[in-house]
Amino acid sequence: MATSAIQQSAFTGKTGLRQGNEFIRKRGNFGQARFTMRRTVKSAPESIWYGPDRPKYLGPFSEQIPSYLTGEFPGDYGWDTAGLSADPETFARNRELEVIHSRWAMLGALGCTFPELLEKNGVKFGEAVWFKAGSQIFAEGGLDYLGNPNLIHAQSILAIWATQVVLMGFVEGYRVGGGPLGEGLDPLYPGGAFDPLGLADDPDSFAELKVKELKNGRLAMFSMFGFFVQAIVTGKGPIQNLYDHVADPVANNAWAFATNFVPGQ
């Protein structure tokens, strides 16, 4: 019983904290709407990133903060000019989407930069530029993972597409629709087997890690947008663009390319 209580406190915060507002989260389940009530416990007040005295998006010059942005959730800087968080159900859905996209963006940013960085340091494994790597499947011989045909050898784009749809569709459908493996777990921060290092065991540290995850995730989403723009404008990967900028900052920067860029040329 004591062990169970300790584990429960690691995910809900310290005993005696004021419970926050109830949020209704609508979740699709194979075409049928399913509503679940979830009460969120306010994060540890010791953290400077939560509560009414948390940092705001413009610091002391921030305008009046909406009443529904109380600092209860990580990443809340009091900015909602468009009123996207006014509806509790929409707010809950948007928070879930932001966390998930943040995690994908962090993985994507690593995948866009790490292979190119390795190639710059002498590691050879075929095409390293992220937006060119996938096209190797159309080349003679197909696409070899890490340039090694003994690992994953892909020759059919249709097979890759079907595999992606089946595997990702199954996992995402299970996450959205729910299932026995997820019963009783927070859909965003499940813990347990998903936290093998026990990083969320301490509620104060857990509250800080939630903020760090969102801050880095937001940066990663902007980075991915920048990688797409760089690919369209320069036709180079992010590491090569960085090298070019360091070598000649005046000629290789966003302003220089924006003033000279002609679509289609």
From Swiss-Prot:
Binding site for chlorophyll b 3: 156, 172
GO biological process: photosynthesis, light harvesting
N2-acetylarginine found at: 38
Pfam families, per the entry: Chloroa_b-bind
Any one GO MF annotation of this record: metal ion binding
Residue span of the annotated presequence: 1-37
InterPro entries: Chloro_AB-bd_pln, Chloroa_b-bind
Keywords, ordered alphabetically: Acetylation, Chlorophyll, Chloroplast, Chromophore, Magnesium, Membrane, Metal-binding, Phosphoprotein, Photosynthesis, Photosystem I, Photosystem II, Plastid, Thylakoid, Transit peptide, Transmembrane, Transmembrane helix
Protein residues bound to chlorophyll a 5: 212, 230
Transmembrane feature ranges: 151-171, 219-239
Binding site for chlorophyll a 2: 101
Predominant location: plastid
Chain positions recorded as chlorophyll b 5 binding sites: 164, 261
Oligomeric form and interacting partners: The LHC complex consists of chlorophyll a-b binding proteins.
Protein name: Chlorophyll a-b binding protein 215, chloroplastic
Organism for this UniProt entry: Pisum sativum
